[in-house]
Amino acid sequence: MKHYSIQPANLEFNAEGTPVSRDFDDVYFSNDNGLEETRYVFLGGNQLEVRFPEHPHPLFVVAESGFGTGLNFLTLWQAFDQFREAHPQAQLQRLHFISFEKFPLTRADLALAHQHWPELAPWAEQLQAQWPMPLPGCHRLLLDEGRVTLDLWFGDINELTSQQDDSLNQKVDAWFLDGFAPAKNPDMWTQNLFNAMARLARPGGTLATFTSAGFVRRGLQDAGFTMQKRKGFGRKREMLCGVMEQTLPLPCSAPWFNRTGSSKREAAIIGGGIACALLSLALLRRGWQVTLYCADEAPALGASGNRQGALYPLLSKHDEALNRFFSNAFTFARRFYDQLPVKFDHDWCGVTQLGWDEKSQHKIAQMLSMDLPAELAVAVEANAVEQITGVATNCSGITYPQGGWLCPAELTRNVLELAQQQGLQIYYQYQLQNLSRKDDCWLLNFAGDQQATHSVVVLANGHQISRFSQTSTLPVYSVAGQVSHIPTTPELAELKQVLCYDGYLTPQNPANQHHCIGASYHRGSEDTAYSEDDQQQNRQRLIDCFPQAQWAKEVDVSDKEARCGVRCATRDHLPMVGNVPDYEATLVEYASLAEQKDEAVSAPVFDDLFMFAALGSRGLCSAPLCAEILAAQMSDEPIPMDASTLAALNPNRLWVRKLLKGKAVKAG
């Protein structure tokens, strides 16, 4: 059985107040002066004080083995802030730190360890505030308004580096080879790790480590680094430094899922919902010039226009990619929304998913068997449901304590307003009819004979994504649904959490004293007309799931208040994020893929054409991380996702899976 919880660090604090690992019998940092040692070994060993002002790119990438207390990261962040203050006009604008940690500290232990360095408190407090729950995989933290990105990879570094997507190859400018001493933790210091470090290092990239062990020096040399010894810190005689002076040949493990970015920094986004809003912010943060074309007269008039939407992860015992993506997407979304400098109605009141029949009870039992962190999800017995939700249901279930609800329409509008303040250009009532390549750009033809030319285009227009020749064969489908808006009652006013059953019910929004109840489901439909049948069906599903609950019977839908929208979905319930695949070229190039994997070319795609679609009913959960993934891909930056999970988001995945098995592929 796959477990989705990471074991925390087993440590104690010695007489000097230094954290010590019980498992490895080693200190996390020097009792003498850990801060100065970090500055000497890692910042000095990689010559960062000299390299920062001379760096020719806007982003500097550092990777580290063993995050521990975060001392190396915090020290580097402090130094980077000092550099930016002293060199405001420098080419280098942002710092990206990637670290691997098998046994992460708890938030409490992290805060206790940070008390050692009062001068780092301004940075340490920001790290503590966003410290992620112990889930495997990558946790992206956006710090200092996005100027500093921290990717925390929880798990074994030798496993995680082998699971990296090829897009991370040759991205690392400097390596901090840290961790417990080789004699204490020999499982980490392997040739596989040294080879991975070399593969990920940019030509000209450097490394530094506190150890001078001969097998470490020889292993790094064998991997491709040019190594030298340097005087060690304090009483330590020697340490090691290295540089990648050659350009190593790069492996391509799965070319059919290869992702390509763009050297250009100008893009048009087509759409008007939450995907467009969040992607605009992510691209603007990376220095892109962004223009948005919305077919409607205002934003959030499509699937993103609801008054209340639930935020919680989609989990399944039988789908590892689904679990890995949605658990990390959910935790990223909470961190993202919490630091977003815009106002929107929301309440992180928790979400409880109830087992209202035998099938749903079995599904919940399977989810609970996955050893999930209690911060993510916990079981709740029937007699406790009323206490935590405020209403009686006579059902047990699973509760997501960090879930809740938010107003998607308000979020989308206000994020777009923020993006406009940062340079986003928006054109409303621009209905894209078709697009074509012209002189290494995309020519966009809109209704009313309007035209525009852009270097890069992102299609993020929901269920209308397949209306163009380049996307007409995508395996996506429309789902029309109606959400009912119901006035509160004395009993409903007691509801403290979002309830999920064969539908969902939100607590009242204090702004309007209404609840949302929904939603109907009509696959293949794009009908947005009000339906009295759907209105009654939303009420009846609630009653059918909780037949003994008097409060459910008193739900009133007679005022016909509702909102109808159309979602875009996929068969496997995962979004489609990445390059727009070329269907015809894919069939030609991969006609013999099942027999000739070793000869496969890179995935056929349309140059500089991307898509962000098929968010289904979990867009509030998935959109923030998907926006970050796509913006990173487009900008040729590290992507916060392992290769196999990232492949599960690739727009060509459903075709390629069949082709890998030698099966026929049909359009749509």
From Swiss-Prot:
Residue spans crossing the bilayer: none
GO molecular-function terms, A-Z: flavin adenine dinucleotide binding; oxidoreductase activity, acting on the CH-NH group of donors; tRNA (5-methylaminomethyl-2-thiouridylate)(34)-methyltransferase activity
Keyword DNA-binding among record annotations: no
Names of the cofactor(s): FAD
Region (FAD-dependent cmnm(5)s(2)U34 oxidoreductase): 270-668
GO cellular component terms, semicolon-separated: cytoplasm
Enzyme Commission designation: 2.1.1.61, 1.5.-.-
Region annotated tRNA (mnm(5)s(2)U34)-methyltransferase, chain positions: 1-245
Keywords: Cytoplasm, FAD, Flavoprotein, Methyltransferase, Multifunctional enzyme, Oxidoreductase, S-adenosyl-L-methionine, Transferase, tRNA processing
Keyword Protein biosynthesis assigned: no
Compartment(s): Cytoplasm
Catalysis: reaction(s): 5-aminomethyl-2-thiouridine(34) in tRNA + S-adenosyl-L-methionine = 5-methylaminomethyl-2-thiouridine(34) in tRNA + S-adenosyl-L-homocysteine + H(+)
Single GO BP term: methylation
Pfam families per the UniProt record, alphabetical: DAO, Methyltransf_30
Chief place where the protein resides: cytoplasm
Similarity comment: In the N-terminal section; belongs to the methyltransferase superfamily. tRNA (mnm(5)s(2)U34)-methyltransferase family. In the C-terminal section; belongs to the DAO family.
Function recorded in the entry: Catalyzes the last two steps in the biosynthesis of 5-methylaminomethyl-2-thiouridine (mnm(5)s(2)U) at the wobble position (U34) in tRNA. Catalyzes the FAD-dependent demodification of cmnm(5)s(2)U34 to nm(5)s(2)U34, followed by the transfer of a methyl group from S-adenosyl-L-methionine to nm(5)s(2)U34, to form mnm(5)s(2)U34.
The protein's name: tRNA 5-methylaminomethyl-2-thiouridine biosynthesis bifunctional protein MnmC
Species for this entry: Shigella boydii serotype 4 (strain Sb227)
Gene: mnmC
